Amino acid sequence: MTVQSNNKLASQVCEACHVDAPKVSDEELKELIGLIPDWVPQVRDNVMMLEREYKFKNYKLAWAFANKVSELAESEFHHPSILLEWGKVTVTWWTHSIGGLHKNDFICAAKTDQLGD
């Protein structure tokens, strides 16, 4: 992954998303996932999501990272699932209102990657 590719998404701002907002197409998914290759598309309960696991040396560092993700979520008004475990944080982004992936999810995934830098 190039930092420039990730920055292309991370420099963008989430837009307000409503129930009738379009989900990303298969073509858009291929393009956008190429910009954040450490993220894995997952389908749960027929809902496409983006997921990534981050590893840390201990619980305290994982907790600090989870807090940073929470602050990002509030600033973007877009909220992921965050699973905090000893030495590990799993972040899952999807757009609840449309039941799938929107460009906002990719923007937030890219911004999440930058939190560890």
Swiss-Prot record:
EC number: 4.2.1.96
Principal EC category: lyase
Entries under Gene3D superfamilies matching the protein: Transcriptional coactivator/pterin dehydratase
GO BP term, pick one: tetrahydrobiopterin biosynthetic process
Full protein name: Putative pterin-4-alpha-carbinolamine dehydratase
GO molecular-function term, one example from the UniProt record: 4-alpha-hydroxytetrahydrobiopterin dehydratase activity
Domain of life: Bacteria
SUPFAM superfamilies: PCD-like
Provenance organism: Colwellia psychrerythraea (strain 34H / ATCC BAA-681) (Vibrio psychroerythus)
Catalytic reactions on record: (4aS,6R)-4a-hydroxy-L-erythro-5,6,7,8-tetrahydrobiopterin = (6R)-L-erythro-6,7-dihydrobiopterin + H2O
Family designation: Belongs to the pterin-4-alpha-carbinolamine dehydratase family.
Pfam families: Pterin_4a
CDD domains on file: PCD_DCoH_subfamily_a
UniProt KW keywords: Lyase
